[in-house]
Structures are given as C-alpha cells and as structure tokens.
C-alpha cells in the first residue's frame, strides 16, 4: 500500500516540478523578445546535471574519501551483499569503506551494473550484523530501483529552473524591451519569480528524495525479511549522526541525499529542507510493516 502511494506521490511531484518549469518558461517567453536565449540555459542546466549523474559514483566516493575493500578486509559486508544481491537476482555492486567515524552508508552509480555501496567505519562499528544487513538491503534497493536516476532528473529540472530564473532577474531589463512603445518586463515580477521558482523547485526535489527513502526502507525490509532490524539501525543512526555529524562542506552537502541518514545537524525550519524524512516516521512505518504493536 505504501509502495503504490509513494510511487504515485513521486509521479505527482515530478508533475509539480515540470509545472514550475513550464510556468517560469511561459512567463519569461511572454516577457522577452528573444525567448530562444532561454534554450541556452536549459541546455546548460541539463548538461551539468547529466555530467553530475554520469560521474555521481566518483563524486560521492571522493567526497567521503572512500576506498574499495576486498572480501578479506570486510568478509561480513561482502557476504551480506552477495546474499542479498543473489536473492534480488541483481548484480553485486562494488563495496567501499569510508574512514570517517560519522555513522552512515550510501549507494551510488549510474545503474545496477555500475554501482557502488559504501559504509563508513563509524556505521560498521555501531551496528550489529543484523542491523547492518538491514542497512545494506536499503542501499541495494536504491540501486535496483534506480533512485539515483530519479534524483538526478529531479536535480536537473531544479537546476534548469534556477538557471532560467537567474537569467530572468539579471538580464530581464536588457531583453524585456525598452524602446518607445514596447512593454518592458516587470522587474518586480522577475525578482519574485527568481526567488520563488527555485525555492519551489528545491522543495519539490527534496520531497521526491524523501519519498524514495520511504520506498528504499520498505523494499529493503522486504528483501531482508526483517523490517525491525532496519528500524533498530535507524534508531542508532539518529543518535549517532547527532553525536558525530559530517562537516557541512560543499562536496559532502552535494552527496548527502544519497546517505541513509541525514549526516548533518538540522532542527526546526531546517527540517523542511532535509533530504530525509523524519526518523520517527520511518521507524513507525517499518514497525507497521513487521506487524509490531506498541
């Protein structure tokens, strides 16, 4: 039930972000005498996002200073991932470990054939084997559900909207007319558009990311057959990430949406702009999936 609802919600959110893009495009096209110039910014935004998607694995792994690990180094991690990949009838991703003690894990890569799963030293020390299995099941389902593609497309659209909005506010007066008898683009409307459109696109993008987290929780729990193991891991991660957050460096911020838990401290209004749903809600859903009653 949750799975169908989340899939529908993702589709609706994509419709919303496309709606914002079409709205801002229509407004600027009606305001400027050279609407074709906007195409340049669309191409730039899409090209930048495509590059980020194609190189997402390397970017995230470098940001976390991760290194590949052999089966001799991490036999338990290899065994769990091999068993779960076999159960899912999917390719086994490459395995990495990050030296940071901040407890977290993430998956990245273009597709199941070119994927990587990374655990930090902190999470390997924090969780027991059952909980680690739950986390790895979650990460594998991000790969197998192609959530990296989903988040990249959402990011691409948000980037295009931001580029067009910036174009409008900085060059609107130049392209909006100005000769006698010609109507000039409304500078106040352009300013509001440049502020509100990227904000709306970002909020929708983050909502898509949160929805995909719910699906990875549920699908990963079904893959392992142990929803309560992932729920237990999330409880530990909620406390662990608060005690040992990652520094808010740009490279880490750009990769944070891939991680199983929000790696930064964030309270109050900051929660609205979190790439992750509330831990309490994720845990409650997993307990409901297991038929757990308080």
UniProtKB/Swiss-Prot annotation:
One GO cellular component term: plasma membrane
Active site per UniProt: 139
Regions that span the bilayer: 12-32, 34-54, 152-172, 188-208
Disulfide bonds: none
Enzyme Commission code: 3.4.24.-
Binding site for Zn(2+): 138, 142, 213
Swiss-Prot/TrEMBL keywords: Cell membrane, Hydrolase, Membrane, Metal-binding, Metalloprotease, Protease, Transmembrane, Transmembrane helix, Zinc
Alphabetized GO MF terms: metalloendopeptidase activity; zinc ion binding
PROSITE patterns named in the record: ZINC_PROTEASE (PS00142)
Record InterPro entries: HtpX_protease (IPR050083), Pept_M48_protease_HtpX (IPR022919), Peptidase_M48 (IPR001915)
Alphabetical GO biological process terms: proteolysis
Bilayer topology annotation: Multi-pass membrane protein
Cofactor note (record): Binds 1 zinc ion per subunit.
Cofactor: Zn(2+)
Main location: membrane
Family: Belongs to the peptidase M48B family.
Protein name per Swiss-Prot or TrEMBL: Protease HtpX homolog
The organism's taxonomic lineage, starting at the top: Bacteria, Bacillati, Actinomycetota, Actinomycetes, Kineosporiales
């Amino acid at each position: 039930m949750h799975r169908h609802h989340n899939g529908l919600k993702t589709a609706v959110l994509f419709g919303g972000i496309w709606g914002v893009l079409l709205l801002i495009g229509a407004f600027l096209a009606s305001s400027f005498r050279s609407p074709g110039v906007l195409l340049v910014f669309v191409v730039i935004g899409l090209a930048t996002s495509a590059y980020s998607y194609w190189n997402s694995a390397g970017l995230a792994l470098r940001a976390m200073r991760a290194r590949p690990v052999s089966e001799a180094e991490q036999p338990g991690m290899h065994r769990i991932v091999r068993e779960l990949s076999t159960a899912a009838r999917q390719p086994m991703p490459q395995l990495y470990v990050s030296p940071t003690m901040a407890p977290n894990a993430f998956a990245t890569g273009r597709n199941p054939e070119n994927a990587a799963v990374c655990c930090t030293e902190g999470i390997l020390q924090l969780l027991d084997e059952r909980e680690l299995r739950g986390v790895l099941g979650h990460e594998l389902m991000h790969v197998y559900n192609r959530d990296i593609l989903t988040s990249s497309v959402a990011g691409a659209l948000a980037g295009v909207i931001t580029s067009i909005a910036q174009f409008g506010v900085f060059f609107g007066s130049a392209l909006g007319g100005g000769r006698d008898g010609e109507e000039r683009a409304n500078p106040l409307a352009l300013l509001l558009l440049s502020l509100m459109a990227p904000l709306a696109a970002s909020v929708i993008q983050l909502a898509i990311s949160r929805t995909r987290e719910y699906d990875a929780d549920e699908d990963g729990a079904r893959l392992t057959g142990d929803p309560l193991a992932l729920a237990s891991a999330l409880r530990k991660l909620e406390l662990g990430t608060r005690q040992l957050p990652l520094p808010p460096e740009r490279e880490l911020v750009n990769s944070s949406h891939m991680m199983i838990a929000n790696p930064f401290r964030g309270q109050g209004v900051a929660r609205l702009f979190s790439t992750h749903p509330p831990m309490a809600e994720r845990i409650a859903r997993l307990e409901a999936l297991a038929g757990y009653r308080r």
